[in-house]
Amino acid sequence: MPAQRGGALSMGAAGFWILVLSITSALADSNNQGNSEPCGPPGPPGPPGIPGFPGAPGALGPPGPPGVPGIPGPQGPPGDVEKCSSRPKSAFAVKLSERPPEPFQPIVFKEALYNQEGHFNMATGEFSCVLPGVYNFGFDIRLFQSSVKIRLMRDGIQVREKEAQANDSYKHAMGSVIMALGKGDKVWLESKLKGTESEKGITHIVFFGYLLYGK
């Protein structure tokens, strides 16, 4: 019996102290909650973490503005020098300082102002086409107390006609025409007045022609 009482007392004492500790802990928690203080300031940032993995490529953005011009590049080497072929030439200018000869025949001019290519025949008064192409032909007439009627002919066909008369004064008349010629075509001036109709006074006639461009 005494042994049983002792064991019962020991168990009762242990339960008593457990109860005391539980109450004490509960009271301490209650006091801590009632007397809590505000949190302190944030601490300094921690060190950076290690870089993460690269993300997926983003969508294509709009085009940007043009960039500034670049600096000029170095000067290139000189190009090759080639000899250009000379342009074909055909020209003449002739003059007559007297009354025209008999009508309806080529006027034979006495003075060659230019005939370097030799395409105008001074003996016959005719220009012979050597270089086919487009030509400009013209004549210039100066009169004093005289009259003329001149026509420009091509292979026997009249192309242009000019009439001028100066009684007691000087007069100036001129004419020109552009036409295409083939090789061998002939061009000349001829008078339509008889020599007796224009023998008095002074007459100067200049006849000229030149190639504009070849065919």
From Swiss-Prot:
List the subcellular locations: Secreted
Which tissues carry this protein?
Plasma; synthesized in the liver.
Region listing for Disordered, in residue ranges: 29-96
Supply the source organism for this entry: Tamias sibiricus (Siberian chipmunk)
| Sequence ranges assigned to domain Collagen-like in this UniProt record | 40-81
Q: Where is the signal peptide?
A: 1-28
Q: Which Gene3D superfamilies match?
A: 2.60.120.40
The primary site where this protein sits is secreted
Spell out the PANTHER family in the cross-references: EMILIN ELASTIN MICROFIBRIL INTERFACE-LOCATED PROTEIN ELASTIN MICROFIBRIL INTERFACER, PROTEIN HP-25 HOMOLOG 2
Q: Where is the composition biased (Pro residues)?
A: 39-51, 60-77
The organism's place on the tree of life at top rank: Eukaryota
List the protein's name.
Hibernation-associated plasma protein HP-25
